[in-house]
């Protein structure tokens, strides 16, 4: 068995990442699998580690296993974006795990491979790339989705929450997001969004949020784009506009089951290349991580990423 490298986020999923790693490490030692492991110490560290690992005797680096949440995997693919011959594996240990849902990845897959109970399959899919129009040299990649508008605004408010450190110290992290959501609901203003695709430019008014999805799942399992397929080189775009306050929450309830697609004010279409423009700078996130503001362009990655499951 070839040399394996691990990047582990020990704090993912309320320290579930560390527990998962210890169980895997036990099997690796038992089966005498040659490996090296690296634990992240702060946000952004997984990207740095991935970039550093890719320079360590590249002939050895054929397999990289990531243990953590969607944010950890997001950092790693951005650290390895110039390396085409590496096979990635993912062991879900986070809170949302949309990536593992979208690709039917289970925690037990790697353990079964180590025990030689299961023979792994290698699948390919195309990442999405974000090009910032203000700085065309800056490019980032995403695996799951892009969110523009309200949900990104909530995430931003959660990061800026005035008493965030106090709540974390008191182990009241679970209250930060709901309180930020309430504040965002009272202060967020819908916006006008222009979308330019390969064929046309469309304009949407009174927009609450827009989602660009690489697979069906969003926000911890909601089926925002039920027909999205990560093996296609197209994105599924969902735009929600003209929603009264209460109806917006009913829409989110239906979205949990993928039943929102025919509601008034919901527009869905596919595109390979799309640029978003707004009059004001509207925040957006990639895979749940706040990345910047509009305008920006999305396209499919030129070469596919290989995932071993």
Swiss-Prot record:
May catalyze the ATP-dependent phosphorylation of lipids other than diacylglycerol (DAG). In fact, is not able to exhibit diacylglycerol kinase activity in vitro. NCBIfam families: YegS/Rv2252/BmrU family lipid kinase. Keywords: ATP-binding, Kinase, Lipid biosynthesis, Lipid metabolism, Magnesium, Metal-binding, Nucleotide-binding, Phospholipid biosynthesis, Phospholipid metabolism, Transferase. The keyword ATP-binding applies. GO terms for biological process: phospholipid biosynthetic process. The active site is at 289 (proton acceptor). It comes from Bacillus subtilis (strain 168). This is Putative lipid kinase YtlR. Gene3D superfamilies: 2.60.200.40, Probable inorganic polyphosphate/atp-NAD kinase, domain 1. Signal peptide: none annotated. Belongs to the diacylglycerol/lipid kinase family. Pfam families: DAGK_cat (PF00781), YegS_C (PF19279).
């Amino acid at each position: 068995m070839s040399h394996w490298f691990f990047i582990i986020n020990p704090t993912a999923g309320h320290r579930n990442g560390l527990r998962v790693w210890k169980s895997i490490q036990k099997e690796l030692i038992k089966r005498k699998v040659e490996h090296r492991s690296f634990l992240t110490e702060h946000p952004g560290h997984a990207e740095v580690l991935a970039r550093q690992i890719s320079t360590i005797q590249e002939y050895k680096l054929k397999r990289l296993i990531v243990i953590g949440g969607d944010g950890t995997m997001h950092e790693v693919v951005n650290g390895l974006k110039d390396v085409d011959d590496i096979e990635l594996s993912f062991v879900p240990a986070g809170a949302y795990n949309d990536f593992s849902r979208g690709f039917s990845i289970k925690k037990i897959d790697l353990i079964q491979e180590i025990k030689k109970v299961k023979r792994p399959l290698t699948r390919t899919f195309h990442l999405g790339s974000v090009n910032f129009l203000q700085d065309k040299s800056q490019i980032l990649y995403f695996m799951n989705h892009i969110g523009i508008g309200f949900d990104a605004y909530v995430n931003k408010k959660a990061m800026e929450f005035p008493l965030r450190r106090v709540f974390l110290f008191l182990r009241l992290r679970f209250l930060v997001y709901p309180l930020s959501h309430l504040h965002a609901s009272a202060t967020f203003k819908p916006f006008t969004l222009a979308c330019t695709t390969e064929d046309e430019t469309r304009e949407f008014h009174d927009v609450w949020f827009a989602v660009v999805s690489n697979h069906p799942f969003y926000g911890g399992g909601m089926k925002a784009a039920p027909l999205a397929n990560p093996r296609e080189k197209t994105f599924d775009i969902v735009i929600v506009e003209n929603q009264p306050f209460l109806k917006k929450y009913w829409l989110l309830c239906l979205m949990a089951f993928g039943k929102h697609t025919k509601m008034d004010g919901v527009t869905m279409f596919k595109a390979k290349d799309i640029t978003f423009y707004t009059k004001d700078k509207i925040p957006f996130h990639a895979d749940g991580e706040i990345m910047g503001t509009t305008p920006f362009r999305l396209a499919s990655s030129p070469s596919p990423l290989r995932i071993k499951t």
